[in-house]
């Protein structure tokens, strides 16, 4: 049989938990009075000097005038971009983004809140939040945006050298990448001793041109020039035969993927209330 002290102790605990649950419920309903919706962002990378896209999707809503899209950046006061009542509202936009942002207005009703960012800069890197408010509810998700430079490599045969060689060039990379060569015939071979790689700073003093030369190549073989940093990986392939030269290039952005977020404050409140009921039965 429980002592008087134990009864008082559990009574106090029950009251605290019930009050906590009630507060959470009040906050949850007070903030929105609606359900929370799913918002999904996609981690992506921006190429310096070019236009980029910060991807964000949400549950579609045909009531365009009731949709509010806000983009925020960690460490920046003001908004990156705001769209509401069917049009842009840039009255609170931070100056570093002026004239550089736009949403895909004709795709908002189908759930596209992606942000177009013009003339990507190194300083655009960081954590962004895509915040959505519709007639169905509200939600948000974070996005990690990396900035750098990356480009396709081009491989050519250098017939002017004393022995046949391959020259791999890529015009713009940042941060400085690693470069490696591979051969279809000599798989696993280390070509570092028969290749030479250099980096030349471009005129804007940020990005660099990558040049790598592979010596003593043989015909009827396929060689690959691989350039990679923490943002992207590019591969250029070349096949040299007696009669022709075949080339192929591809570029892959690294560490890209979805980041869904579903808020559920109300559920937490009900969980606390359920716990308090269990304790009251003790």
Curated annotation (Swiss-Prot):
It is found in: Cell membrane. Residues 258-282 form a propeptide. Glycans are attached at residue 216. CDD domains: IgV_B7-H4. Keywords: Adaptive immunity, Cell membrane, Disulfide bond, Glycoprotein, GPI-anchor, Immunity, Immunoglobulin domain, Lipoprotein, Membrane, Repeat, Signal. InterPro entries: BTN3A2-like_Ig-C, Ig-like_dom, Ig-like_dom_sf, Ig-like_fold, Ig_sub, Ig_V-set, IgSF_BTN/MOG. GO terms for biological process: adaptive immune response; negative regulation of apoptotic process; negative regulation of T cell activation; negative regulation of T cell proliferation; positive regulation of interleukin-2 production; positive regulation of T cell proliferation; regulation of cytokine production; response to protozoan. Residues 35-144, 153-241 form the Ig-like V-type domain. The keyword Transmembrane helix does not apply. A lipid is attached at residue 257 (GPI-anchor amidated glycine). Pfam families: C2-set_3, V-set. One of its GO terms (molecular function) is signaling receptor binding. One of its GO terms (cellular component) is external side of plasma membrane. It is a lipid-anchor; GPI-anchor. Negatively regulates T-cell-mediated immune response by inhibiting T-cell activation, proliferation, cytokine production and development of cytotoxicity. When expressed on the cell surface of tumor macrophages, plays an important role, together with regulatory T-cells (Treg), in the suppression of tumor-associated antigen-specific T-cell immunity. Involved in promoting epithelial cell transformation. This is V-set domain-containing T-cell activation inhibitor 1. The lineage of its organism: Eukaryota, Metazoa, Chordata, Craniata, Vertebrata.
């Amino acid at each position: 049989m429980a002592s008087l002290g134990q009864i008082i102790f559990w009574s106090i605990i029950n009251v605290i938990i019930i009050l906590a649950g009630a507060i959470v419920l009040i906050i949850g309903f007070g903030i929105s009075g609606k359900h929370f919706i799913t918002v999904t962002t996609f981690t992506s990378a921006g190429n310096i000097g070019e236009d980029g896209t910060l991807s964000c999707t949400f549950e579609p809503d045909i009531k365009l005038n009731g949709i509010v899209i806000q983009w925020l950046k960690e460490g920046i006061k003001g908004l990156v971009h705001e769209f509401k009542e069917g049009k842009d509202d840039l009255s609170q936009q931070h100056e570093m983004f002026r004239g550089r942002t736009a949403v895909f207005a004709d795709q908002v009703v189908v759930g596209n809140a992606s942000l177009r960012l013009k003339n990507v800069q190194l300083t655009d890197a960081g954590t962004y939040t895509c915040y959505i408010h519709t007639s169905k509810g509200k939600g948000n998700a974070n996005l990690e945006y990396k900035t750098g430079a990356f480009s396709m490599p081009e491989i050519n045969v250098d017939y002017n050298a004393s022995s046949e060689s391959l020259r791999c060039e890529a015009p713009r990379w940042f941060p400085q990448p690693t470069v490696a060569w591979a051969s279809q015939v000599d798989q696993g071979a280390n070509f570092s001793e028969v290749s030479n790689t250099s980096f030349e700073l471009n005129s804007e003093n940020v990005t660099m041109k990558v040049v790598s030369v592979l010596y003593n190549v043989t015909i009827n073989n396929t060689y690959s020039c691989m350039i990679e940093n923490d943002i992207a990986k590019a591969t250029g392939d070349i096949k040299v035969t007696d009669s022709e030269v075949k080339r192929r290039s591809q570029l892959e952005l690294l560490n890209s993927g979805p980041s869904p977020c579903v808020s559920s404050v109300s559920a937490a409140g009900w969980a606390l209330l359920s716990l308090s009921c269990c304790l009251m039965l003790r």
